[in-house]
């Protein structure tokens, strides 16, 4: 690639990004494909086929960051990685659809087509935060992988603009994330990505609140960790006594989630009772999942008094995005309410990777097509 295409700081990021993408993507992308990608991207850069976006970001680095995020968070997928790297070259006329179809296959061409369709739709609509636009987006995309790539690309962008000098641009992107991309991530079951998008959006639009909550969480980490350990200890002993195979851990809720609770409950952080959740993940065959989840439920609720009004049973009726879990809130030590989530390892994969888990881990390529169940998901409220 021509040296002037990369600024000095960008060149410093390029090699680590390449290595990371090779490491994460090696299971799905052959070395020969990586070599061909490198050649076509280099040719595109030398021909001036890439255009920096309105933030002045290097499109090659942005595409690579999105591909890296895809592999890291959802698992590597050859066609999605190739599509995100070739999309800009196709959009700006350097690489024809026929060439992509011939050299990279129909699936890559289909994803690139979808990205072009939603980009065109995006450029023609000013009210991108409306429910109508989200439904149009899902209709035009046709393929769930297109929406997933849009979401991971936006997360890559959000990470990249932390120190951007134009605060208005940063605010615009952050607000767009909060009313379009985070709700889409939620509706596809990409909860980890949704949380990071919302945290970054809060950080950029209300840095003072973000910093205050982060500081308070850091201040109270030791006492919170000790409480979680005390809560878990008897539960763990009883689960082991019952012969269950499991992993149990505590996690602090996201900063944006805590801020929403503070606003909803009209309280400061000291008086928010569910700053963290306990997660029990059972290693169990699919046919025994529900029985063992309910057994774990009975163990926890025998030990700690439950709040029946806060039971959320997504075992009997999973969410439309595939999410399955039992959520309960119990009265723990020191008179504190504690949320406990109970699920199997299979359910945990779906909880982390959302609808992507269905087509990737089941090998069901037909499920990449957005269908009526996903349309139903698009009408769900943005928070659970």
Regions found by a protein language model. Give the residues of each.
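Hydrophobic or amphipathic alpha-helical targeting/insertion segments
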Residues: 85-114, 190
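Alpha-helical scaffolds flanking conserved acidic
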Residues: 61, 76-86, 107-111, 145-146, ...
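Nucleic-acid processing machinery
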Residues: 1-27, 39, 46-53, 62-64, ...
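Conserved small/polar residues in nucleotide/adenosyl-binding loops
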Residues: 368-372, 384
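Short, mixed-charge amphipathic alpha-helical segments
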Residues: 24-40, 97-107
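Short hydrophobic alpha-helical segments enriched in small aliphatic residues
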Residues: 375-377
């Amino acid at each position: 690639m021509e040296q002037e295409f990369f600024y000095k700081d960008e060149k410093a990021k390029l090699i680590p990004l390449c290595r990371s993408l090779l490491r994460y993507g090696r299971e799905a992308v052959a070395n020969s494909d990586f070599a061909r990608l490198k050649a076509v991207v280099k040719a595109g850069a030398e021909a001036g086929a890439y255009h920096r976006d309105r933030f002045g970001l290097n499109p090659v680095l942005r595409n690579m960051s999105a591909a890296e995020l895809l592999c890291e968070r959802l698992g590597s997928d050859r066609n999605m990685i190739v599509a995100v790297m070739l999309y800009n070259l196709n959009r700006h006329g350097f690489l024809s659809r026929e060439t992509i179809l011939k050299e990279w296959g129909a699936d890559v061409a289909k994803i690139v087509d979808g990205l072009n369709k939603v980009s065109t739709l995006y450029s023609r609509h000013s009210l991108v935060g409306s429910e109508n636009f989200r439904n149009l987006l899902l209709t035009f995309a046709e393929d769930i992988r297109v929406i997933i790539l849009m979401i991971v690309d936006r997360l890559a962008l959000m990470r990249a603009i932390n120190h951007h000098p134009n605060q208005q641009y940063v605010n615009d992107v952050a607000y767009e994330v909060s009313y379009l991309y985070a709700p889409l991530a939620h509706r596809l079951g990409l909860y980890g990505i949704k949380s990071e998008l919302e945290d970054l959006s809060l950080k950029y639009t209300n840095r003072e609140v973000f910093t205050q909550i982060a500081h308070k969480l850091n201040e109270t980490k030791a006492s919170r960790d000790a409480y979680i350990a005390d809560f878990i200890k008897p539960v763990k002993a009883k689960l082991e006594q019952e012969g269950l195979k499991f992993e149990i851990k505590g996690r602090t809720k996201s900063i944006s989630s805590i801020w929403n609770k503070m606003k909803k409950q009209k309280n400061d952080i000291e008086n928010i009772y569910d700053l963290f959740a306990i997660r029990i993940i059972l290693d169990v065959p699919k046919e025994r999942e529900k029985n063992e989840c309910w057994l774990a439920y009975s163990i926890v609720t025998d030990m700690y008094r439950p709040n029946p009004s806060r039971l959320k049973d997504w075992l009997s009726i999973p969410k439309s995005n595939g999410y399955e879990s039992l959520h309960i809130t119990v009265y723990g030590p020191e008179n504190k309410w504690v949320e406990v989530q109970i699920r199997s390892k299979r359910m945990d994969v779906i909880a982390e990777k959302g609808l992507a888990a269905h087509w990737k881990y089941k090998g069901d390529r037909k499920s990449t097509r957005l269908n009526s169940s996903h349309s139903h998901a698009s009408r769900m409220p943005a928070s659970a």
